[in-house]
Amino acid sequence: MDSLDQKVFELLARPQRQEELRRQLPGVGKQALADCIQRLTASGKIVKNKKNRLAQAAHYGYIAGTFLATERGFAFVAPDEKDDKGDIFIPPHADGGAWQGDHVLVRLGEDGRRRDGTPRREGEVARILERSRAEILGAVRQRGKSFVLEPSSKKYPSEIVLPKAHLGGAQPGDKVAVRMMYYGEGRVLPQAAVVQVFGKNGTMQASIAAILHENGIQEAFPEDAQQQAGSLGDRVPADAYAGRRDLRDELIFTIDGDSAKDFDDAVSLKPLANGRVQLGVHIADVSHYVTPDSPLDAEAYRRGTSVYYPGHVVPMLPFALSDGLCSLVPGEDRLAFAAFLEIGPDGRCHKAEFAKSVIRSKARMTYNNVNKILDGDAELCKKYDFLVDTARKMADLADLLRRRRMERGALDLDIPEAEIAVDEQGEPVDVFYRPRGRAEKMIEEFMLQANEAVAQFMDTHNHPAVYRVHENPDPEKLRVFAQFARPFGHRIDPSKPQDTRQLQAVLDQAAGDPRQRALPTLLLRSLARAR
């Protein structure tokens, strides 16, 4: 809100007429005040009652928020101003014609009750403040001589009319995205225009394209970002080596999944004269190529992350970088940033050092092959004889680090992850649990150690940083979990959420018992989300 809007809003903490309000705002013109009131009313911040008295919406029992439809008829409204009372329940037929994502004004009624007996706010939509601009996905169907959209989600009306002039080339059976033109009233059906055609409904190609579109994920990069990426070439420039630690002769290698295409981290391990070892965690130095406020930086910021789905990836950076200069492929010079951790026989990190470097990976290893090497596979041990001893020492070090971490009260949920296998056409052919052997756990452990060392460094040197924090479990959620676990012989004290050892004891005892397979997942849902 601007200064006038804020001032008027504050004055309307008590009801008053517009004329009374003007007297408290000398120097503010009649039209300026009228415009201000219009803005505040349109946004749902203030309301006028039948006696023409204006007041903050909450004073008259109104709350503005976002309409969240469900597929079961009822809905919720997420208030603009968050509080500890949660979302507002909207019963069926009290939605006031609102659709998913609309900004609405809710008139609160008497509190209702949740299934567990706790109170919840209920209300009805009094006014639609602003329609959502979100597009709707669905399939084109023909009804006689007319065409309709059959939305993919039941959160929307079952049919939306598609005028022939607004089909956008779509044919019956196509998966499309539409933009609403008219929301309907009485017996008149809503109407929309097709803005994107993805292909035949039900095909893998159309389904994936629709999901990416719905979530604002764009595969193609802007021209300026592509030009910047192309100008970098495919080799590390000669002037980039200066001031970097040269690690090209050291035994550094990557370990990733079988289907991985970009390799952005690598590891190394070497003994020190003082009886300790130096663990090296090396990540691609992307910042050397993606400079602040450049086209690549702006596009990476907009995307936020790479998006992976079975058999494909939509990268945060163009493939020239993600699969090229910033991928630690074997035998090629690559710019990196290294964390060197000096670890003693007791598993304690005595020293951490960080440096920009240039590396040359000696091998592209997979979790599968490293696990086989650790199990003594003769053929692979012979093929990779130059790193077998190092891999075994790495695995032993990871076991030591994990034991020390567990002694500090860490939780090892070890929840299996499903993986979807696809064929060459991208069609799913199998679903299986992703294996998690010693190699997978080893890399997890090393990354945890590196991140902990970086966090410690930032904190010690008072550098501003964003920390990932896990708070203690909620005692009430822990109580529910304790009740579920009790029939299996587990005893948990919900009043001691900070005592993670009692939770790890449950996980240890449940491991390998098919009857208790759900316990790790239920415990995960009882924990506070990282923030």
Predicted regions and their residues:
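Electropositive polyanion-binding surfaces
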Residues: 23, 177, 182-184, 200, ...
